[in-house]
């Protein structure tokens, strides 16, 4: 159970961090 919950937590974190990184890169490119 712990491995499944930690996996979903990691997946959720990746889904939230990845778009943030793309937005940051786009802002840097615009500047």
Swiss-Prot record:
Major place of residence = plastid
* UniProt keyword terms in alphabetical order: Chloroplast, Electron transport, Membrane, Photosynthesis, Plastid, Thylakoid, Transmembrane, Transmembrane helix, Transport
Q: What does the entry list under GO cellular component?
A: chloroplast thylakoid membrane; cytochrome b6f complex
One Gene Ontology term from the biological process aspect of the record: photosynthesis
**What molecular function terms (GO) are annotated for this protein?**
electron transporter, transferring electrons within cytochrome b6/f complex of photosystem II activity
In the UniProt record, does the keyword Membrane occur? yes
The record, for Pfam families, names:
PetL
Q: Does the keyword S-adenosyl-L-methionine apply?
A: no
Q: Where in the cell is it found?
A: Plastid, Chloroplast thylakoid membrane
Q: Which residues cross the membrane?
A: 4-24
The membrane topology term of the UniProt record is: Single-pass membrane protein
Quaternary structure and partners = The 4 large subunits of the cytochrome b6-f complex are cytochrome b6, subunit IV (17 kDa polypeptide, PetD), cytochrome f and the Rieske protein, while the 4 small subunits are PetG, PetL, PetM and PetN. The complex functions as a dimer.
* Recorded family membership: Belongs to the PetL family.
What is known about what this protein does?
Component of the cytochrome b6-f complex, which mediates electron transfer between photosystem II (PSII) and photosystem I (PSI), cyclic electron flow around PSI, and state transitions. PetL is important for photoautotrophic growth as well as for electron transfer efficiency and stability of the cytochrome b6-f complex.
Tell me what this protein is called.
Answer: Cytochrome b6-f complex subunit 6
- The primary gene name is petL
